Amino acid sequence: MKEYQIHLELDRSQQHNFLYPLLFREYIYALAHDHGLNRSTIPLENGGYDNKSSSLSVKRLISRTYQRIHLSIYAKDSNPNHFIGHNNKFYSQMISEGFSVIVEIPFSLRLVAFLEGKEKEMAKSHNFQSIHSIFPFFENNFSHLHYVLDVLIPYPIRPEILVRTFRYWVKDASSFHLLRFFLHEYFNLNSLITPKKSNSIFSTSNPRFFLFLYNSHVYEYESIFFFLRNQSSHLRSTSSGPLFERISFYGKVEDLVQVFVNDFQDYLWLFKHPIMHYVRYQGKSVLASKDMPLLMNKWKYYLVNLWQWHFHVWSQPGRIHINHLYKDYIDFLGYLSRGRLNTLVVRSQMLENAFLIDNAMKQFETTVPIIPLIGSLTTARFCNSLGHPISKPTWADSSDSYIIDRFMRICRNLSHYHSGSSKKKSLYRIKYILRVSCVKSLVRKHKSTVRVFLKRLGSEFLEEFFTEEEHVLSLIFPRALFTSRRLYRGRVWYFDIICINDLVNHDKLEIVPN
């Protein structure tokens, strides 16, 4: 126990006193506790505002709100439940954005200092910033493994869980009053803390604020997970990034261990294994190990208890799956991945005796999930539920070049993102739907027929949807046309993709152009 206490002993000076007492003084307590705020009738324009809200503008806004509260009390407002007219969203968003900017300052400075020490290592691995770099990691490290723990990280149901998580990083009490005010307001009005979709927390009216809170929640979860993982492994990781700037860590881990057994060392030996890999993107994580299903079940039991007892979140049964890598698919980052055994028969002959030797070659296969992609196209009104292309009536007022450019952009980004697929047939199906939908949209605009329109436009238009990616590869390999065609049919991983394709998220289809 003393050994682990030494590892977990951190400097309490890393706790931060944020700038709220200096900037806002008593206004924070007024916002958090003064119910007169709900009786305010402040007229405010609905005009746009700068997303980069400064702390000065937020301070002025809070001062105006505080003054108007007293004016409304003296005026004896006849409608006490009227909340800042129809501009409640504007006030909350302005203040919460200023809150996000300020709380990010100490974490950003700490992160920059940490990255400066890793500058030489990062210069050698700058390509690893791409999402596609995860799949070569799968190919190199997962091909000899057998079991995968597919995990969906649950979100905190109660706002107080987020506030408590935030308290481990700071000691400024006024910050918690303001944070609690925003969380309860958003939770009561919009239920943003328990989103129906896994990624709807990122598409709220203030994504920066909730993104910061969500990352704090995941960081809290992974810091405990990585500590126990490193202590239980024979090959311990040398990275200390997930553990910097934590307080009261030892007591939390000790309480967590008491849920399982009384002896910390007896608990850790249950998970000792030399080969284990962990990968996460947003709210989905993958934990892979070799042929030890008992070990994976114990890690599943550990994660469920961690969420239930430490984060007070009830984990649904469908959030953790134990899959066999060579029998089940892993749905990760818009790809369906699994291991595959290819048998290679070799004929060997010694003198008069001939032998047939079967060699099993292990490969990692990645394919495009056709059904979710068709579901996204159906939601975006490019096809029906059966996958039959339909026209896009909302673009009928646009020019022909604009409509064609929109469809081409979607196809180009889709081909670019799914270029690592082992089988291109599903990708061709999606591009066919978009191609026919583009034609039908133009036909509907010109009130013509498909045959007449294609005859006037020519067949070159249709070929562009299929030759765009091959043209890009021919520019990369100008002297080897055969090489570019072979790469186009095979798997290609790009190192310039820094965010997941919106089509994969199944929420929206439009992609930001490069």
Curated annotation (Swiss-Prot):
Q: Changing residue 367 to I: what effect? A: In strain: Isolate 24/2 AMO 02
- Single GO molecular-function term? RNA binding
UniProt keyword annotation of Zinc present: no
Substituting residue 467 to M results in: In strain: Isolate 24/2 AMO 02
Q: Does the keyword Ribosomal protein apply?
A: no
Organism lineage: Eukaryota, Viridiplantae, Streptophyta, Embryophyta, Tracheophyta
Result, substituting residue 509 to F:
In strain: Isolate 24/2 AMO 02
Q: What is the effect of changing residue 495 to L?
A: In strain: Isolate 24/2 AMO 02
Top-rank lineage group of the source organism: Eukaryota
Protein name, UniProt field: Maturase K
Annotated Pfam families: Intron_maturas2, MatK_N
Q: Which PANTHER family match?
A: MATURASE K (PTHR34811:SF1)
- Gene, per the UniProt record: matK
The alphabetized UniProt keywords are: Chloroplast, mRNA processing, Plastid, RNA-binding, tRNA processing
Q: What does this protein do?
A: Usually encoded in the trnK tRNA gene intron. Probably assists in splicing its own and other chloroplast group II introns.
Enumerate the Gene Ontology biological process terms.
Answer: mRNA processing; RNA splicing; tRNA processing
Instruction: Read off the HAMAP family from this record.
Output: MatK
Q: Its family? A: Belongs to the intron maturase 2 family. MatK subfamily.
Gene Ontology cellular component?
chloroplast
- Where in or outside the cell is it found? Plastid, Chloroplast
Organism the protein comes from: Acer monspessulanum
